[in-house]
Amino acid sequence: MLFDKQRWQEFAAGYSIFDCTIFDKHRFVCLSYEITDSPHRDPLPRMRLLLVRASRPLDAKRFVLNEYGNFGFARVSSNLTPMEFAAVDTSGHVFSYDAARAEEEPEHPRDLASSDLAGVVNQVVRIGQSIYTVGGPRRLHKRLGVGQWQDLSKNVPWPKDVATPGNGLKYMWRDASGFSESDIYVAGGEGDVMRFDGQKFSKVAFPSNELLHNVHCAGDGRVYIGGNMGSLYVGRENTWKKLAGGDFSVPWKDIAWFAGKLWCGSDYGLWTLEGDKLVRAQVPADVQLTSGVIDISPDGKHMLTAGPDGASLFDGKNWQVLFSRHDFE
């Protein structure tokens, strides 16, 4: 058991998981928010970043908790070289943790060259051996170190209508994934997909202008893109095919390739792609209740998934429910 009742009350009770990241089967991070009754997030609910070291004894040494009250919606990712995790919210607040430090950093860059607009961070991802942030309008940054972010989108094609009122979502990138750090796909906005070769961006001829939420460069050599209300596309460069219509009430939170198949996670659990058809994942019921966001360990051996009420771990053969709110509340 990852928690006992005492540690649950101390570290997790009253909080809902929003994102997660995994180093290996023994070390992972859950980003969660305080459960409140405020319909307008005013004041902001408190954010917790809980580092779990599952191989340690069930005492305070198993958990490292950091808590903040000034973060909006944040996402988190991790890296092994150096071993660290970083969380960034939509307004550019940054928290990072490594062996020597755990603290809030200077804000993530938000200024847009030759513009009065401010950038927004929507996602934090690991590509290759680096952490990247994705946002809008058309923003991609690579983490170089504490307080250091390389703006890769300086030379991205800049639409003439980006500042037109009502176009706030049109170029709002929401996700990025790469076969390598010189073959990255970025997606979001209204069918706004680009490929980055490590030096420059090129526009991808995508067949839809629907709002896009996810992109994943998969182990089968293809790129999968998740659209509005759970639609799914597959392709690469300028050739694409729609696999599934947007028949769900919510978009995917994450899509990922693991154990030879594509996994899609949402507020309602996990789906897998079988052939060219999306089906409800054949996993235990308690796993479905503790799934949604997805992260794959850097060595590719474990998949961590988490939902508001808990988290589960998969090694390609066996599932382990790490914890569930239903066991304690």
Each model region followed by its residue ranges:
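Residue-level hotspots at or immediately adjacent to binding/recognition sites across diverse folds
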Residues: 1-329
